[in-house]
Amino acid sequence: CVACHTADGGVPNAGGRPMATPFGIVYSTNLTPDPATGIGGWSFSAFQRAMREGVSRDGHHLYPAFPYTAFTQAGDDDLQALYAHLLAQPAVAHAVPETRLAFPYNIRPLMGLWNALYHQPGPVAPVAEQSALWNRGATLVNGLGHCTACHTPRDARGGELARSAYLGGALVDGWEAPPLGALNRSPVPWTEDAMVQYLRSGHHAHHGIAGGPMAPVVQALAQADEADVR
């Protein structure tokens, strides 16, 4: 959460970070428990609806710069843990700038049509033919990890090309988010241990250094359980 919800030089998770999109600049929200400017007045049900359906507490649609299309796959236990952690932070009174997109993207009710095209709310059922480890990995990659948000290309409406180019690579802030899996063009094949080392340390002798938008991802994964990263 910190990577997107912290402005340069700001308090962690107090929001206000500008995120450039093809449709305008979106400002991240205050995730601290301040009741006036943050989520201090949010019930778990409201938090869960935002994470799974992309709808704020007051009923307005959120923009998919907040990757609820991925977070919808998170399990109930993970969402409960996130909610508890966020509300245990120090409350910071910080009103963030209002997001103002150009017409027609500023008409939030149109997000209902976008969601009908690109959003399938709710957790995905485990694949019975796969192991528990594989299913946990799929939940993390496609859900809370939201790897597809950067590593899957998007169409002109900002929707992920998940069916035709899932994890097929994309450009993010001028950086290449390379294809993952079988489509990766690395001259040295990735091994499981190499991937774990890279994701937790940001470096591997055969695969270079994680820079650009990937750097804060590594900073977060360095604190994650190795079992989840693996």
Regions picked out by a protein language model, each given a short descriptive name:
Residues 1-8, 47, 82, 86, ...:
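The canonical Cys-X-X-Cys-His
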Residues 5, 52-55, 87-90, 141, ...:
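Protein kinase-like catalytic domain
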Residues 10, 19, 41-46, 56-63, ...:
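Extended intrinsically disordered, low-complexity coil regions enriched in Ser, Thr, Gly, Ala
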Residues 20-49, 69-79, 165-204, 216-229:
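Electron-transfer interface patches adjacent to heme c in soluble/periplasmic c-type cytochromes
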Residues 57-60, 88-97, 128-134, 155-160, ...:
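Inter-heme linker and motif-flanking segments adjacent to c-type heme-binding CXXCH motifs
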Residues 62-68, 106, 213-214:
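Short, conserved phosphate-binding/catalytic loop or strand-edge motifs used
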Residues 94-112:
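Extended, well-folded interaction surfaces typified by the phenylalanyl-tRNA synthetase beta subunit core
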Residues 113-142, 184:
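Electrostatic cytochrome c docking/interface patches
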